[in-house]
Amino acid sequence: MTQEEKQQAHAMLTDVLSDQCEQVAAIEPRLDDYLSDLVTNPDNHNGNELLGAIKFLRLLRTYETDIETFRDVVYKYEGIWQQTDGGMWHHIEGGLKHPGTTGPTYYRLQPFQVFVLAAMFCLKAWVNTENEAGSRELLPTERIGSDGMIYDLRRLCTEFTLFTPRKTAKTQLSAFIQFWYFMSGDENAECYCCANASDQ
């Protein structure tokens, strides 16, 4: 991506985020923090981040949202945190303990990690099951379309590959996603998490 293309992407993101700022903040404030940082500090981010944010906002305008599932994923990872008057965050309850330098501890997701989880879990689409209305009972996630077919509300993102730089808790986040699918996710889900050292 050339510098000119990055500037065009930045201008486009600035424009679309201004229209969707309230919608994004209502989903999760850290999602808004990440997207706003892309706009205010574009030199700290690469062009693919800008394009990914533009695409996410377009998908958010186009498809159904499943904020409940997204918030469940975030809660199971980190639990509930509270910010003190001094600005420090303290863990209150819930969430999983993760391996840390001083033993098992709770971690709060960073804004870019919240964006990753939102892209995976927040968007849903109506999919034609190729069954006609009346051919069977409807499941709780289904409805009858205007064409007389049964449609099911499913996650839009069904395949996801995460590439991030070193020291961004990618192995920990990937392992958590596997855990979430095992405990709460779709049946027959397949998740693969690779690390380059056995102690990870």
Q: PLM features: residue spans?
A:
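Phosphate/NTP-binding elements of NTP-utilizing enzymes
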Residues: 1-200
